[in-house]
Amino acid sequence: MADIIIKNGYVLTMDPEVDDIPNGVVVIEGGKIVEVAETTSATANTVIDAQGGVVMPGFVNTHTHAGMTLFRGYADDLPLAQWLQEHIWPAEAELTASDVLAGTRLACLEMIKSGTIAFADMYFFMEEVGKAVEECGLRAALSYGMIELWDDEKGTNELKKGREFVKEWNGKAEGRISVMYGPHAPNTCSKEFLSKVKEQAIADNVKIHIHVLETEAELNQMKEQYGMCSVNMLDTIDFFGPGVLAAHCIWLSDGDMDILADNNVNIAHNPVSNMKLASGVAPVMKLLDKGANVCLGTDGCASNNNLDMFDEMKTAALLQKVDTMDPTALPAKQVLEMATVNGAKALDINSGVLRKDYNADVIIIDMNKAHLSPLFDVPSQLVYSATGNDVRTTIVNGVVLMDERKVLCMNEQQVINDAKQAASDLVSRVDAKN
């Protein structure tokens, strides 16, 4: 007997080898998908009627800072330097482990409710992030954010912390948690330190998560410091490869794009954050045309201000259309692939499509709503009309985390209350020092 059968829904497989099934079934057993078909003879302990819904792979958020939910709306509409120096950095200096735990629990709740099944996170107090992921049932690729600032002693300590986190948490939560090394960025970490990180990642057989060319200021700093941009500098130390997840990648030359594509680097595009901070527009269409694996991330709530991948998909599609002045750029199905297939590839998880033997990481979206009617084209409707609030059910590793909008793995109101209190206390501590 199977664990779960999902029936009567429009099955959007995201599988290039299998057509969508307008009225199909998905059968789940032992945390895996065992059948995707029009009908089934299987029986199950749980039967979910997806009538009026779309059954599809859950989303993969490939770049965020989950604990920063506590900073949602804290300092908006400010120049980047002022935003960081006068608000975010002083607040982060007061963060405690319990703050990050409360903020991450809130982030996990928000992601479950909006259909995200896995996320890549870089922040501090990462053990607390691991605890939150372990509790809630999501998948995550976690990295301790290492900032060395050309200080050898600091770099040694940062790499030690990163290694300890890798050893303690990689593979935890029944394999739902993987750990990556997280050197923050080329403009906060020296070339020598980044080279050491690459060597350590190879030795430990783990991936790397890094910010690359998020701002024009980084581009200018790298040219002044090294006589070349971040991508070229990283290429000189053989930093790149399929085990690298590079966030942002905005200020790229054509040569930079070739380097990233040729080295199979995974690129996390964060359009909402990039627009909000006026960082620039990533050349997504050029990167995709060169064969790069471009996926989607939300960045942290301080610069987004939510973790809704529907929001990210629509923004990504619209931004590329206006940037290229081509309404056919980044069509709905392609941006859906970025949010599912490409993201799963970047995090090396066997998810992102509805296919036999793949992880049972499945969401159901309620399409029987005014803003989703009439329904002519499912991918188009999901990208341009749907929101995270339309997700009805979220399943990860064959476990139902949310059913009919009710979260089963967390006390929703308690999580919200705890995060509100943590944010209030944090701001009070910051204000007391000013």
Swiss-Prot record:
Q: How does it assemble?
A: Homotetramer.
Q: Which EC main class describes this enzyme? A: hydrolase
Q: Which HAMAP family match?
A: MTA_SAH_deamin (MF_01281)
| Entry EC no(s) | 3.5.4.41, 3.5.4.31, 3.5.4.4, 3.5.4.28
Q: This chain belongs to which protein, by name?
A: 5'-deoxyadenosine deaminase
Q: Name one GO biological process term.
A: S-adenosylmethionine biosynthetic process
Task: Relate the protein's function as given in its record.
Answer: Catalyzes the deamination of three SAM-derived enzymatic products, namely 5'-deoxyadenosine, S-adenosyl-L-homocysteine, and 5'-methylthioadenosine, to produce the inosine analogs. Can also deaminate adenosine. The preferred substrate for this enzyme is 5'-deoxyadenosine, but all these substrates are efficiently deaminated. Likely functions in a S-adenosyl-L-methionine (SAM) recycling pathway from S-adenosyl-L-homocysteine (SAH) produced from SAM-dependent methylation reactions.
User: Has keyword DNA repair?
Assistant: no
Q: Which reactions fall under this protein's catalytic activity?
A: 5'-deoxyadenosine + H2O + H(+) = 5'-deoxyinosine + NH4(+); S-adenosyl-L-homocysteine + H2O + H(+) = S-inosyl-L-homocysteine + NH4(+); S-methyl-5'-thioadenosine + H2O + H(+) = S-methyl-5'-thioinosine + NH4(+); adenosine + H2O + H(+) = inosine + NH4(+)
- Pathway assigned in UniProt: Amino-acid biosynthesis; S-adenosyl-L-methionine biosynthesis
The prosthetic group or cofactor this protein requires is: Zn(2+)
Q: Which family does it belong to?
A: Belongs to the metallo-dependent hydrolases superfamily. MTA/SAH deaminase family.
Q: Does the keyword Zinc apply?
A: yes
Annotated GO molecular function terms are: 5'-deoxyadenosine deaminase activity; 5'-methylthioadenosine deaminase activity; adenosine deaminase activity; metal ion binding; S-adenosylhomocysteine deaminase activity
As a miscellaneous remark, the entry gives: SAH is a product of SAM methyltransferases and is known to be a feedback inhibitor of these enzymes. As a result of this inhibition, organisms have evolved efficient enzymes to metabolize SAH via different pathways. The pathway found in methanogens differs from the canonical pathway, it uses the deamination of S-adenosyl-L-homocysteine to form S-inosyl-L-homocysteine for the regeneration of SAM from S-adenosyl-L-homocysteine. 5'-deoxyadenosine is a radical SAM enzyme reaction product which strongly inhibits radical SAM enzymes.
Binding locations of Zn(2+) = H63, H65, H211, D299
- Binding positions for substrate? E92, H184, E214, D299
The note on the cofactor says: Binds 1 zinc ion per subunit.
Q: Which UniProt keywords apply?
A: Hydrolase, Metal-binding, Zinc
